[in-house]
Structures are given as structure tokens and as C-alpha cells.
């Protein structure tokens, strides 16, 4: 639905296209990951087990736009904050919001841009033939929003602006790309297995001398 709007907008012709690739697989990943400029890792802080896709993207030179969740935290530690785009609440802030009673409507009411986004969904802008298609989504966002998407919205938009700004500066973008590639050695299987052997399994290598 969103693709139909974007891809048929004459203002964006030749500049932007939205494509959904079904049945994502390793074979498709081998084509997509090396070609990516940005890797969006947008899970709510503290909710996702550490995956490896963000590492693969970074190793291939894509810059990460993500929350402080999973391996994003370690990527930040290794590449430095100037070579990654972090947004959203921390785990502590997420938990604090839950404890005091998270009210997504507050964010919806106070942020004009967010209000317009939700309003467009409610009005059926992306599905004029079925205006109620996204009712479950919009009601969940406004009245429940377990993953606190509305709380992170403004920070995400601001981070996207930083992406745009850096992308305009070819030298800075290339520098960040190189920094991501050369600092991904931390995620090597050799280092990981060595740390598991030392800190978890408590094993030592056997001597091969006879």
C-alpha cells in the first residue's frame, strides 16, 4: 500500500522506490547486504535477542540506524558514536515508562508530525479501497503500543535527518563506511569461541605434543 503511493509520486520518480522482497533467504541476503547503505535495526531496547544481520551489514559497509538493543550496543562500542545512528530510549527508560504507566496517546497528541502519520493511516490514505484496513494497527498504537513505537518516533525521525545530512557529505559517509568495516573484527567467531572457552566453558586447549 505504501509502495503504491511512493512509487507513483511524480516528485520521487528516479529518486526513491519502495520494494518489498518476499521470502527473504540467505541467497537474497547475499545480494541485498553488500548493496545496502543503511541497516535499520529498530527493535525496542531490551526486547530482541542479539542477531547477526546487523553485523553482516556493518561488515559490508552499511551504517546502522538502530536502537540500543542487541548487538547494536556492541557495534556502537566498536565503531564509535560518530559512525552509527542511535535513536530511542534505553532499556532503563523503557522499563521506567512501563512502571509509571506508558500512555502512547500523550506522544500522539503532542507531536504534530506523528499525529499526521496516524491520521493518514486512520483516514485510509494508503488503502483508499479499504479505509479500515489498518484499524487494528492504529488502535494498538494509540491505546496499547507495547513496543513503545510512539515514544521512539521523534528520536527516529531526528536520526533519519542525521542520516540525510551525512549522506550529502561523500567523504564523511565513506569514512564511516570504512570505520564500520575495519572494526567488525570484534565479531569474529575466533574471538567469540575464545571468550566462551575462557569465561563460560572454562576449558583449555589440549597439547598436541606426544
Language-model features: where?
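Nucleotide-activated donor-binding/catalytic signature segment of Leloir-type glycosyltransferases, i.e.
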Residues: 1-26
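Short, basic, glycine/proline-bearing loop/turn elements
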Residues: 14-15, 39-41
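Short acidic loop-to-helix transition motifs that present clustered carboxylates
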Residues: 23-27, 46-49
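An anionic, turn-rich surface loop/hairpin at beta-sheet edges
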Residues: 30
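Catalytic binding pocket for nucleotide-activated donors in carbohydrate/polymer assembly enzymes
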Residues: 33-36, 42-177, 181-186, 191, ...
